Amino acid sequence: MKIYPYNELKTRFAEYAKPGEFNITSADTFRIIRLHYDEKQGCLFAFCNTNIKERVLQFYFKVKLNLYSYKQCYDKHIFPSCRNKCISYTTFVAPGVEGNYLNKINVIKYERNKAAPSDNAACLDKFLHNVNRVHMQTPFVEGAYMRFKKTQRCQNNYVGGSTTRMFNLQHFNEDFELVDEMTLTSGIMPVLSCYDIETHSDGHNMSKASVDCIMSIGFVVYKNDEYAKFCFMYHKLPTQIPETYDDDTYVVMFQNEIDMITAFFDMIKITNPDVILDFNGDVFDLPYILGRLNKTKMLLKRYDLPAAAPTTKLFINKLGNKVDTYYFNYYIHIDLYKFFSSDSNQHKVENFQLNTISSYYLGENKIDLPWTEMVKMYNTRRLDVIAKYNVQDCMLPIKLFVKLKMADSVYSQCILHRLCTDDVICNISHLISVACFYAAITNTRINESTGKEEPDPYFFNKNDLSIISGQFKADKAAAGISNLKRKLIPLKNIPKDAINLGPANQTVKYKGGKVLKPRAGIYKNAFSLDFNSLYLTIMIAICACLSNLILCEDGNVYLNHNSRAIVVKLLLKLLSERCKFKKNRDNQSESAFLYDLYDQKQNSVKRTANSIYGYYGIFYKVLANYITRVGRNQLRLAISLIEGLSNDPEILEKFNLGSITFKVVYGDTDSTFVLPTFNYNEISNETDTLKQICTHVETRVNNSFTDGYKMAFENLMKVLILLKKKKYCYLNSENKIVYKGWLVKKDMPVFMRIAFRTAVEQILRHLDMDKCLQSLQTSFYEYYDEFAKSKSLTDYSFSMTYNDNPGKKRKSTDDNEGPSPKRRVITVARHCREILVNKGTDFVPGNGDRIPYLLIDIEGKVTEKAYPLRLFDPVKMRISWIKHMGILCTFMNELLEIFGDEQKDKIAKCFTAIMQKYMQNQLYDRKEPVLVKINQKKCSVKRKRDDDDDNDDDDDDDCDSSDSENDTQCANNTYKFCLYKMKK
């Protein structure tokens, strides 16, 4: 750690991002890192990187081009030609029937840089960023590799083209060539950076930008595999920081806070990163910086370009909460917290705090510096530890970005689906909307006379999706798709093979895939047969596309069987691309770069294809329901085919068996668990023969399918424990244990998950109930004895997601009609957050955050006992174990369901011993376990209700995941544990 005056630091880094003049030859490959379109100038700025002599060199160039948008034409079109020169497009949603009548929308294509801001704000493609439009209308794509056709001179990081003209889209082929990634041996990465702020407070309340200063701003740049670390610190009093030689951080002291913030912005321009990362920056850091600047604008500069203020866009998360997202124009800005919390692939981490994510992916933790201690250090001018803490918080996000190869992931989305780097935290429905918009407007058809492809454009009007999903209720008496202004097609003109989806004005309740109710128990040598991409296959088979919907005069909606529909072709293209990318990936035995590149691309294509079904679930549930209905029928057919192979002569002869039966013991949406029963003495090599039998069953079943349906043998389960629907675990033939839906929930304390899994492992590996219970008791005893000693408090905590979304609009003081709104429920998460706010902690959870907490041993309800883990002091507070014991009670009852009444006494003995241990020092809610007889009458009533709800004409064993779950119907036990208060 070395202290520098700011001017000296600027001089030291003056050449950091300025390589001087250099040539970029036609042999030098460069990568487009960031695109920015200036509507006022009608000019595209391309920020690029190239590797010359194993070092990253950065430059930019400008391209003169007009960017187009679309707006609806409302002219009455009395004359043959429109004065607005509009084009008539076929509507993407429910267009009608070709050859009879197709609904049209008249659209004006106009130049954005010449239009009024009001036109651009109200255009039909307003959900797109300008860079999305660049990707669709030009060959320039973020993440693409390119070369100049002629040697270019770079001066002051700018490549200006020839002396006679600047780069122009019309001369693209003269100036540029696209580079096939297959010809590359290494990638070109963006220069990364991350910042983080530390704020002051009075120690009792959370920091407020209106009164509390920014103590320090950490800033780290990662370039050429090296870190440049900075810490800008503010203190109104002259302060000395001891220099150290084991830390290469550059520290600059300021006695004026605004000067510090301005210097930070200036250092961004000097170091010139391509990507600026932060962690929860959209919610905390950026609004706080803006608050401290007060009326001064936040302006970011790059190269010699005009300074630009960040722009904001409203982001709605999965809980429906609204948060501003900040875009930095010349730079890529990514809030990693928002990225992780909105990405469905990140469900494995306990929560989305930086320490948790870093520990999971990197094996690194933040420096442990309590916020109250930091404020005390600042007040006594001991700033060196704060600087280390601040910089470490900047290092971890960069390491995560590199480790998870996020750059290639983001750029794959740009190249494959016309997304842009500003779409990185957008939800999956935005991705599908962008893909559908581009696929619709570039759609083609085969000319029957010439046999050649010709343009057949449709127009994707996102407003139509809002109407059919019920977001816009133009007619309150009607619902959904019936509100579309479409000409109804006569019944006689509906194609014969069209599928009737039901009334257009129906109110739809989503119904999920088929799930069998299993009998709880332990099964040996079961195997799973799963459909390959079931819903994708269904969507292709039935031609599921919004452009295939037909509104009929009889009041129904029909699905046309047109295999050339836009989404059907898109799905076929995605599946073909994935096969190609996987093949190319697997052929890369020498190039790790190409392997990773193709792996990212196949994952991107897979994610997009799998999301289209969910897209229908959001915007048109009728179609999603029909897809799941077909899926349920396919699962029934598969079960029938599998069980029909029992005692099949061909199987008996091939494997020298006297008899064999196949029973599907469980099924869920697209998978089946099959239990083969035969005399194991008749086979020599048990595992190999079982795998051969499974493969044979797979082949026989697939030979019976049509329309491209395929099943695959996935797992041979040496031991399978089935508990109930969507809750099971198994030991596979590779000796690996897999848990699905059971003992995986994040709201269960870590130590309990470990204890339960260790106990269950004794059953899976040894089939020994005694070892299971002994392991359980030992684990619980150990964690009780080591609480607040060798074990982390995090292992004992619960967590709950905080959601501040008020939901329905509350009644105003002027509104005298209608019922009064209900009082807001105080959840555990809300209660804990209020405590954190009142105590003034350094991190206050926002919407969607999971808040870790423990219960303290006081009198009251669970919500009143809840206390945030961050503030829990085991020296001053006594923990309440009652919620832990409630979870243990559930697990013990699950063991009863699996093993039945025969093991109830052993289980009760273990349960009682653990409860006595945990209740020994507790003052309130002291309870003990008691075995009680299950009320069979109530169970039968529940069975009757469940059977009545099943209208699929199935057997009683069948149900759908949308039906209410019946846990007792297939259980083996007639007793269960309940917790009763101990008698005093």
UniProtKB/Swiss-Prot annotation:
It catalyses: DNA(n) + a 2'-deoxyribonucleoside 5'-triphosphate = DNA(n+1) + diphosphate. SUPFAM superfamilies: DNA/RNA polymerases, Ribonuclease H-like. GO terms for cellular component: host cell nucleus. Residues 939-948 are annotated as: Monopartite nuclear localization signal. It is found in: Host nucleus. SMART domains: POLBc. It holds the Pfam family DNA_pol_B_exo1. The keyword Transferase applies. Its EC number is 2.7.7.7. Residues 947-966 have a biased composition (Acidic residues). Transmembrane segments: none annotated. It comes from the Viruses. GO terms for biological process: DNA-templated DNA replication; viral DNA genome replication; viral genome replication. Residues 943-969 are annotated as: Disordered. It is an enzyme of class 2 (transferase). Residues 804-827 are annotated as: Bipartite nuclear localization signal. One of its GO terms (molecular function) is DNA-directed DNA polymerase activity. Keywords: DNA replication, DNA-binding, DNA-directed DNA polymerase, Early protein, Host nucleus, Nucleotidyltransferase, Transferase, Viral DNA replication. Its main location: host cell. Belongs to the DNA polymerase type-B family. Replicates the viral genome, host DNA polymerases cannot substitute for the viral enzyme in this process. PANTHER family: DNA POLYMERASE CATALYTIC SUBUNIT, DNA POLYMERASE DELTA CATALYTIC SUBUNIT. This is DNA polymerase. The gene is POL.
